Swiss-Prot record:
Record function comment: Bifunctional serine/threonine kinase and phosphorylase involved in the regulation of the phosphoenolpyruvate synthase (PEPS) by catalyzing its phosphorylation/dephosphorylation.
Superkingdom assignment: Bacteria
Protein name: Putative phosphoenolpyruvate synthase regulatory protein
UniProt-listed InterPro entries: Kinase-pyrophosphorylase, PSRP
Keyword Nucleotide-binding: yes
Residue numbers binding ADP: G153, V154, S155, R156, C157, G158, K159, T160
Catalytic reactions of this protein: [pyruvate, water dikinase] + ADP = [pyruvate, water dikinase]-phosphate + AMP + H(+); [pyruvate, water dikinase]-phosphate + phosphate + H(+) = [pyruvate, water dikinase] + diphosphate
Alphabetical list of NCBIfam families matching this protein: PRK05339.1
Enzyme class: transferase
Molecular function terms from GO: ADP binding; ATP binding; phosphotransferase activity, phosphate group as acceptor; protein serine/threonine kinase activity
Keyword annotations of the record: Kinase, Nucleotide-binding, Serine/threonine-protein kinase, Transferase
Amino acid sequence: MERSVFFISDGTAITAEVVGHSVLSQFPLTTALYTLPFVESETRARAVREQINALYQQSGVRPLVFYSIVTPAVRHIIEESAGFCQDVVQALVGPLQQELGIAPDPVAHRTHGLTATNLSKYDARITAIDYTLAHDDGISLRNLDQAQIILLGVSRCGKTPTSLYLAMQYGIRAANYPFIADDMDNLSLPAALKAHQPKLFGLTIDPERLAAIRDERLSDSRYASLRQCRMEINEVESLFRNNNIRYLNSTNHSVEEIAAKIMDVLGMSRRMY
């Protein structure tokens, strides 16, 4: 049976989504998802409550509600709904208050809002995103000394999404460089990359998966053929081994998992933004 799931917040609803998805992933559910950010007024909260109640009346099954709301009056309206309501923050606040010995001082938008205390971190993240976009897919090999990581791999193995995730989530300046079909006859590591060997990290992928991804882009082409994909993967993995470049098979991993594994292998600190 499908369950309706609400992620509600007086801010971006990112926290409610992250926690809610993490919990829901433990169960084999089919879900209809509703994300409702910036529920800051009692009027908006009552409208949301009616939406939850209407879905309950239609299905006879309580919607699941993950919420994070600072204002008590607004929070209470959501809690009065017919949904199964779970405050994703308050469950931890009580025990933490006892441990710290101080009372919480909740402020709306503190987690993901822009404040004087996190402005420098925000600027660093924007700088990282700009750098990563300017050094995507081998566009530029200049200023690689400013890169914190340089991802290598064949076309369509996950370099670009991983680079952007590292920049957006952790403020890491990530460049990436592709090895294309024309490189394979005499594959070697460009001199500009050799100078930054400690920053290099390779991504590889199962040939069958690579062929399927490429076929969506250019079907029935040499580029997407299984034979071509196998050859490219073999050549690039050999290059990684010969140059002592650490690498990861991305086939069965999400972008989040790939990024976390890379940072762990390279010993990079995880600074959340």
